[in-house]
Amino acid sequence: MNRLLIFAIILFSLSATAQRNPFANLTEKNGKIGIGTTTPDELLTVKGKIHTQEVLVDLEGAVAPDYVFETYYNGFSEMMPEYSLISLEELEAFLKENYHLPNVPSAETMRTEGISLKEMNLILLQKIEELTLYTLQQQKEIDALKEKISEK
């Protein structure tokens, strides 16, 4: 009798699961799709984690930070005329005052507004390029100091 009862419970559970609507978590409102939300605010809004193998982000309208090297080596960038690499002293002063890198949103801004992957990836690439230039400058200084020492 116990086995029959257990079998009936399992059978009922399986049939109830099979009858669930697999799209119950989807919402469409004003041409916008929501997954896990009833109030989508973009073309596709997902509330929760997304598991994917790859994400492709179009850079339409964005300027890749090649302007960092262009400005450094040419003294000017046609891609981004207003860009200039700040000195390490200026950078340190900015950090002491703001507690984050220039052109990088503050923790508070990220918390309240979120981040755009396209924008943040471009900012981070700019910072990597700037760090590369600072490192190259420091290496030149190290090499010059080594040469001075070896001359003595």
Residue locations for each model-derived region?
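Bacterial Sec-dependent N-terminal signal peptides
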Residues: M1-A24, L91
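Short glycine-/small-residue-rich flexible loop motifs, especially phosphate/cofactor-binding loops
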Residues: D41, E92, L125
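Short, positively charged
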Residues: V63-T109
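Alpha-helix boundary/capping residues
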Residues: L11, L95-N98, K127
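C-terminal intramolecular chaperone/auto-processing assembly modules
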Residues: T109-K152
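C-terminal trimerization/auto-chaperone modules of long, extracellular attachment fibers and adhesins
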Residues: Q19-E82, S150
